[in-house]
Amino acid sequence: MNMNPKIIAIVIVAILAIAAIAVFLVMKNGDNGTTSRSEATDVRLTIFGNANGDDYIDQNDVQYVQDIIDGKKSLEDAPKVQVLKQYKGTYTIRYWADANADGKVDQTDLNQIKNMVNKVKGTKIYFFDVDSVLASCTYPLTTYAVGYKSNYEAEAILGNVANCKYVCNQVGDNGGYAQWFKPFLDQNPVCFGSRFTPDYEVFKDNAPSYILSGTRAWFDPNMEETVAPLGTDVVRLPFWEDTTTVGSILTLGYMCNLDAAAQAYAAKADSVLDKINDYVSKIDTADRPLVFAGYNGTSISTWHNGIQELIVAAGGRTPYDEGYTNGSIDGEGVNAMNPDWIVFDMYYGLLETNDQVKEYNYIYDQGKSNNRYFNAIAGSKAYYDDKVLILGQGVYMGPGSYIGIAWVFNHIYPKAPQFDVASLLKDYVENYHPDYKNTDFMNQDCFDVTSYDAWMSSNVSGYQKVPKTYRA
């Protein structure tokens, strides 16, 4: 791809300016801001033109819009969503039947949906992104640059590894995630550096069709403007922010013309999510188990960080349901909350450091030195009753999250039909990480306080269980 030297100069100047801002933000806070809770409806395929709000763009959507135009259906009753025209702007309503997202549903939308059903190349697709922003791309998406582990997972699930041309420094440059994504490295991709401050100059001679990105709080927020002169689209979908990722896989699958792989993944995840939803739909929120989930028992996470969402998906009640807000919480606060269950999220196991000894000792050491994990919740009734679960990142957030959700559901609803979590993990690993075995991860990604104590007592000389200090 040849570019006008003036355009190259403009792009480079913009990159330098944006990089300076991003470096400041990373040094100051580690991110670009606080993520907000998604305003999406129950629609999972978040592409405008999915008029009836199901998981497909097909002839049913054509008929739906035709019925609106003919007055047979009321537009007011059609599926809709609150969307931002620009990041951190003002919300406005858009109907999913509004394929070109111009604020009205008419013949133009009908024609566009027909093109979308027929998969006409060059069709401009409008979609709802991770930050509730109205975004667009050109169909079909092909070659790409990708950053962060859950995004690599998504491309692997879709069978789209061969189109990878650029990787971030967490996989490239022998980064910490390289061991999990060797098939991507086999494509000889170029490393573009950090997802916060990408080196966009590496794209200029062979620009990718799109960049698979994420929330502007944790990826360069100015990415769209910077790569626009290259003709590269930016796709920001929630591959970890909402824990479950079925909708994001379906959406990206359509955009890349890889619908079959997306639907196959959806069937796996829905085999868990639908059964849980059916079971808990009969239970009022106030009657569901209260679950306090977090990284190490010392804070209540914001929405849109994948933690509260896991509780909801597993059928639990969150601290927010009890009037709590995000922020730090000490042992006394946990005791006052009195959760039925407590869940920790570890940066170990599948897609992280694959070392059970390090993981278990990390919990122990952090408890003693920083009053985290079991030390932080020692006075809680949940700890007294051994109702503490630990999940690894690979099954806690992202495409593998339905496994962790099943594990939590099994425990908080022990009388419900139980999921075979080991089989779910085996299927996931064999399909998407065939270089590994599920037995490598079960004791790292899904374990509880009882099994943890048993292992530590048998393997760590001088191990002392954190005393239970709960008093009724």
Predicted feature locations:
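Cellulosome-associated attachment modules in secreted, modular CAZymes
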Residues: 20-125
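Bacterial Sec-exported substrate-binding components of ABC uptake systems
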Residues: 37-41, 102, 114-156, 260-292, ...
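A short, structured surface patch at a secondary-structure boundary
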Residues: 142-206, 210-217
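Extracytoplasmic ligand-binding site segments that recognize negatively charged/polar headgroups
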Residues: 145, 170-177, 217-222, 237-251, ...
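Alpha-helical, coiled-coil/dimerization segments enriched in small aliphatic residues
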Residues: 172, 305-326
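Structured C-terminal subdomain patch of bacterial secreted/periplasmic proteins
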Residues: 221, 241-256, 263, 351-471
